[in-house]
């Protein structure tokens, strides 16, 4: 038996990339993965490829959708939130709606999810939010990504205090070959990943397994709460 046997884990944003990898990992650890996504067809298709997984419609930017999605989930023991909406632009070129969408996906939505999940999670339950290395590496053109990721880290600490004994933590990935970079084309992707590897202290970029190992640990580490776990090969120091 593992610590996740018979547990039910909701992964919001679980229909692709890192979220889907998390769904597969918790299943292999003995849990039932509940794949939450705003694209119902993609969520259902993803669930078919993960043994025993369930799919539920959940739009993290719509509070009513969060409420109805949680109701359809039934029992939930842990929640992992991987959602994001990027708006990479210099401050002088920021778009109000895109900026708001980034905060909705990364901060406001997860806060609303915590609001409604607090009453259904068991005292031994947990929430894992996703921050990101950009928060610790100021870079022109990426301020919204950095600010929202930094806010996630602070949100984890404050939610851990308020929702205790439910544990809340954040995981901060670096550049991960998760599938999200495939749209660049193979040559451009490899050039990008090579550059990312050089920016770390361990001379490599991340794999999905690096992240899923961290998530599994946070889901089962009963004495860890309010923390941000950095999984980026020391990139924030380089």
Feature names for model-found ranges:
Residues 15, 23:
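N-terminal Rossmann NAD(P)H-binding glycine-rich loop of SDR-like oxidoreductase domains
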Residues 49-64:
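Rossmann-fold cofactor-recognition segment
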Residues 90-91, 98-103, 192, 196:
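Substrate-binding pocket helix/loop in short-chain dehydrogenase/reductase
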Residues 102-103, 111-112, 126-164, 175-176:
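Catalytic loop of short-chain dehydrogenase/reductase
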Residues 153, 162-178, 224-231:
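Conserved Rossmann-fold SDR core element
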Residues 176-199, 238:
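A glycine/serine/threonine-rich, flexible loop-to-helix segment
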Residues 204-231, 236:
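C-terminal substrate-recognition "lid" of short-chain dehydrogenase/reductases
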